[in-house]
Amino acid sequence: MSEEVKEQNLPEVEPVQEAASDSVNLDALGDISKVEKLEKELGEITDKYYRANAEFENIKKRYEKEKADVASYANEKFARDLLPVIDALEIAANFDPEDDEFAKKIKEGILITINQFKKCFEKHGVSEIATDADFDPNVHNAVLRVDSEEKQSGQIVQALQKGYMINGRVLRPAMVSVAN
């Protein structure tokens, strides 16, 4: 009788075990979909991390560039304020002392001062705008159009006021006359 009970129990146990293994397989499938979902989330989070990190690096580079620009152009207002001084010195240097020794010494002193100004300007990134080439509206300001036999149309005939740049940026455009 106990054998009969065992035999009767055996077939019943096997289907239960199969059902259990089916549920394990379903659980495993559920775990696999959870793993896939978690892997997808991990991929999205990793992508967001890389994007945020790249954005941070771009902001950092932009900040460094702005910081360098501020340092580079910090003297811009001061240099602009000095331009009328050097203009006045250059006008003073254009006078003809004739035979007056005292006037010659004054002119010599003015020329030395102008050279010191130019060296100081160069040291701080200030340079003169060339006026011996074609007219460039980005750096020249045409105040006159004149007829010229020596220059072609669009070329600068005469510089009326020197222009200056500071580290590649126009500090003051050159005032020029341009050939028709």
Curated annotation (Swiss-Prot):
Keywords, sorted A to Z: Chaperone, Cytoplasm, Stress response
Subcellular location: Cytoplasm
Chain spans, region Disordered: 1-21
Keyword Cytoplasm in annotation: yes
Listed Pfam families: GrpE
Disulfide-bonded cysteines: none
Family: Belongs to the GrpE family.
Role according to the record: Participates actively in the response to hyperosmotic and heat shock by preventing the aggregation of stress-denatured proteins, in association with DnaK and GrpE. It is the nucleotide exchange factor for DnaK and may function as a thermosensor. Unfolded proteins bind initially to DnaJ; upon interaction with the DnaJ-bound protein, DnaK hydrolyzes its bound ATP, resulting in the formation of a stable complex. GrpE releases ADP from DnaK; ATP binding to DnaK triggers the release of the substrate protein, thus completing the reaction cycle.
Protein name stated in the entry: Protein GrpE
